[in-house]
């Protein structure tokens, strides 16, 4: 079941973020649980954020977190993904999570652009790119990171 996240989901969302973080290019950046908990709660409560979960058999197996912000060159807004992850058990829920995000962004007043990325290196990036393209996204470039020690 895909549903809007609630405060009771924070621990489950944190578990997925920690799992995904261990696979990401940023895995050497220490994850701070207190900061993560606070930020997930803010996202759940904020009208400018979008948080939905995929729940299977009482467990959170996928999550999509997005946000809107004003474009730096316009009075219009952009919606972008902050975190998108589905466990092996939740495979297949990703498209539904993404559809909900896109629908939310399109219904959000002032949003003129939806930006999606595959910047963390988590999971099958090519599969995620294909999902984005099926949803109507157009590839516009690449992202590079300079890891710091």
Residue ranges and their predicted role:
Residues 70-81, 140:
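A conserved beta-turn-beta hairpin within the catalytic core of GNAT-like acetyltransferases
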Residues 21-40:
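Conserved GNAT-fold acetyl-CoA-binding loop/helix
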Residues 53, 59-69:
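Conserved beta-strand in the GNAT
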Residues 82-92:
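A short, internal acetyl-CoA/4′-phosphopantetheine-binding micro-motif in the GNAT/acyltransferase core
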Residues 114-128, 147-148:
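Conserved beta-strand-loop-alpha-helix junction that forms the acyl-donor binding cleft
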Residues 96-113:
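Conserved acyl-CoA
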């Amino acid at each position: 079941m895909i549903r809007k996240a609630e405060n009771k989901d924070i621990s489950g969302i944190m578990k997925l973020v920690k799992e995904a973080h261990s696979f990401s290019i940023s895995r050497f950046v220490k994850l701070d649980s207190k900061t993560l908990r606070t930020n997930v709660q803010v996202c759940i409560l904020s009208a400018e954020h979008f948080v939905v979960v995929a729940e299977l058999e009482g467990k959170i197996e996928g999550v999509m977190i997005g946000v809107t912000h004003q474009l730096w060159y316009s009075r219009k807004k952009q919606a972008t993904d902050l975190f998108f992850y589905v466990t092996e058990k939740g495979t297949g829920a990703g498209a539904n999570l993404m559809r909900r995000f896109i629908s939310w962004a399109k219904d959000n007043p002032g949003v003129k652009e939806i930006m999606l990325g595959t910047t963390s290196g988590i999971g099958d990036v090519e599969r995620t790119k294909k999902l984005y393209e099926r949803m109507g996204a157009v590839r516009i470039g690449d992202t590079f990171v300079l890891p710091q020690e």
